[in-house]
Amino acid sequence: LIADRARSKILLALASGRELSASVLADEAGISRSTASAHLRKLADGGLIAARNDGRNRHFRIAGPEVAGVLERLMELAPPEPITSLRGSTRAAQLRRARTCYDHLAGRLGVGIMHSMLQRGYLAGGDGLFAPEQAVDDHPAGHGRDLDYRVTDAGDAFLEQIGVRVPDSRRPLVRYCIDWTETRHHLAGRLGRGIRDRFLEAGWVKRSATHRALKVTPAGETILEREFGLVLQP
């Protein structure tokens, strides 16, 4: 189902966690609207995406974090797609620097934030590194299961200080993924979503129009250096 190139491009566009229209997804996949409709129907029937009617329009979203995790895993395993344009090269660099992984931050940004919180004692339970020779259930680009990270008292105070509100749900508070570009841990779970939401709400990062890349704003660069000791390289 996801081996088809057009369908995989549709899924990757939706992996940001946002809802997108069929026309936007057709443009992302480089196919016609009618062809996109057929692919979207197959993905919905397969339980990988969900649709919402908005008047005469339909918007689509990824079915859940588990699907996004599978996509990250496949991206790590798949051979890199040849970059044949400046636009493609720029997008690849942007994704490595800062992107969303479903509803949390990934790339150098996500990995750097988690590393900083571990170094400063805001998180405990591991070192943020992926050691394949020691891993039992952890795999690149998948949800981590080997370690049990937790927020410390100092971490609770820090999160309150920078305005992070953790959403209520039955999802675990702290989860982690093995980042597919950095091969280190980034935060997921409710905490990962709360941090992403705060960065977007405060204007520290801005979304791309369609794909998962994020742009760190000047205000975001300041916060990262001041609160996390993190200088994000281009």
Task: State the predicted function of each range.
Residues L1-S32, R58-F60, T100-C101:
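N-terminal helix-turn-helix DNA-binding core of bacterial DNA-binding proteins
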Residues S16, G69-G128, F158-G194, L200-A202, ...:
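Amphipathic alpha-helical dimerization/coiled-coil segments
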Residues L1-R7, G64-P65, L95, G107:
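Short helix-coil-helix linker/hinge
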Residues A44-D54, R58-R61, G126-D127, S208-A209:
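Beta-hairpin "wing" of winged helix-turn-helix
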Residues E19, D54-A78, V151-G155, G220:
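Basic, amphipathic "hinge/linker" alpha-helix immediately C-terminal to the N-terminal HTH DNA-binding motif
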Residues F60-A63, D127-E160, A209-E227:
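Accessory beta->alpha helical hairpin/"wing" motif in late/C-terminal subdomains of nucleic-acid enzymes
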Residues I2-L11, S37, A68, V111:
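Short alpha-helical elements of helix-turn-helix
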Residues A22-I49:
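Canonical helix-turn-helix DNA-binding module
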